[in-house]
Amino acid sequence: RPLPEGLIRGSDASMRAIEAARVNTGRLLGGKGIVLTKRRYQDLHPLRDVTIVCNPPYGIRMKREQDMVRFMKDFGDFLKQRCQGSKAYVYFGDRALIKSVGLRTSWKRPLKNGPLDGRLVKYEMY
């Protein structure tokens, strides 16, 4: 059955990532109804009572460890302050960064992404 327009939304700070996502979602039945925009997570309106799935930058995509730790802390603050009532599933290519988010995990699962032996982590915001 057709996917209602805008039911699933995605964003990224990188236009290249958005273009790749458009190609991939275009292959899905109903994928044309997925709304993708170039936008940093910091610029999103509050996300209340939704499910968030994300693959934030990590080692390969960011250069310095300090930058990654700071990014993850800021991302954790965003989840806590602007995503009340939501569930967030976050992929970590570098397991050491999980603690940098500063939130308690509901669960962690091993998940390979190509050669990366990462973790999918669930957070529940209250």
Where are these regions (language model features)?
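Class I S-adenosyl-L-methionine-dependent methyltransferase catalytic core
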Residues: 1-126
